[in-house]
Amino acid sequence: QGGVSVNCGGTYYSSTQVNRAINNAKSGQYSSTGYPHTYNNYEGFDFSDYCDGPYKEYPLKTSSSGYTGGSPGADRVVYDSNDGTFCGAITHTGASGNNFVQCSY
């Protein structure tokens, strides 16, 4: 998965936290939360530096356990649904309505 840290609208996530989110998503143990789910990339972000998709998204959290339910917050990791490769990170912070903007990484 590599070590990619991201900054989503001023919230910093270490590569460990990013990888934890992907691992939680792949485990399926929190699927009752509705995540992970397909990310269709309606915004047209370019994730090709990291992967080609198809994409899934999962909430990013700073807590040691990562997202395990409840409010998903504004930030998401996007990963390749075939192999779990990190693709990118997106956030509702700074976007209009329910849209996303890309995080920096």
UniProtKB/Swiss-Prot annotation:
Its EC number is 4.6.1.24. The modification Pyrrolidone carboxylic acid is found at Q1. It holds the Pfam family Ribonuclease. GO terms for molecular function: lyase activity; ribonuclease T1 activity; RNA binding; RNA endonuclease activity. Disulfide bonds join C8-C103, C51-C87. InterPro entries: N1-like (IPR000026), Ribonuclease/ribotoxin (IPR016191), Ribonuclease_N1/T1 (IPR051386). The active site is at H37, E57 (proton acceptor), H92 (proton donor). It catalyses: [RNA] containing guanosine + H2O = an [RNA fragment]-3'-guanosine-3'-phosphate + a 5'-hydroxy-ribonucleotide-3'-[RNA fragment]. Gene3D superfamilies: Microbial ribonucleases (3.10.450.30). Keywords: Disulfide bond, Endonuclease, Hydrolase, Lyase, Nuclease, Pyrrolidone carboxylic acid. Belongs to the ribonuclease N1/T1 family. This is Guanyl-specific ribonuclease U1.
